[in-house]
Amino acid sequence: MRLNKFIAETGFCSRRKADELINEGRVTVNKHEAIIGMDVKPEDVVKIDGERVKLNTKYEYYILNKPKRVICSNEDKFGRRLAVDFIKSRARLFTYGRLDFMTEGLIIISNDGEVYNHVMHPRKKLYKSYIAKVSREIEDKDIEALQHGVVIDGKRTAPAKVKKIDKKELRIAIFEGRNRQIRKMLETLGYNVNSLKRIKVGELTLGNLQVGEYRTLNEDEIKYLKSL
């Protein structure tokens, strides 16, 4: 098994992050510094920053309805609440498909490092759906603009799927994952975003979860996630 895949399957981090750690010289195999692309066996001793990592025997998969003012990270120097803190588990958990500090809604949390490749890798083009409430009435020309792509940070966005729900509310689905993308898309068109909530990732939905609640994925959802 490739070392980066081994590290991902321990739940420590994604394959991409594992390669970064290897390049930084923070990974050893049997007391020797690791190199990119090397293979390891289950009995090999793999350490990151001097701490051994082992393959998980059981993976856990959750969906959290993230509240506002919660961080999608495993640490925060300002002491703000973390999304993983909502989950009652002893496993080392990570969030996949980040939401910014003021956005609420569906976030996937797991100790399976391979989730990154299923959900977040750019080549997947997995649509994520949001409900946005804005400061003024939404004009039809702006819906068309979103559907064709708008320029943010000097680069045009991919076409979005957009449906007007009410005068100041719309549903928008995108497959890109640029920083604060939907907020920036709407701000570029002159709208202030009053609230933003993610309701769907691919075919995974919040269901009846209230803000701050979570649930485990069922078998069909896990199979779907791994099929992506």
Residue ranges of each PLM-predicted region?
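Basic, flexible Lys/Arg- and Gly-enriched helix-loop patches that mediate nucleic-acid binding at interfaces
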Residues: 1-228
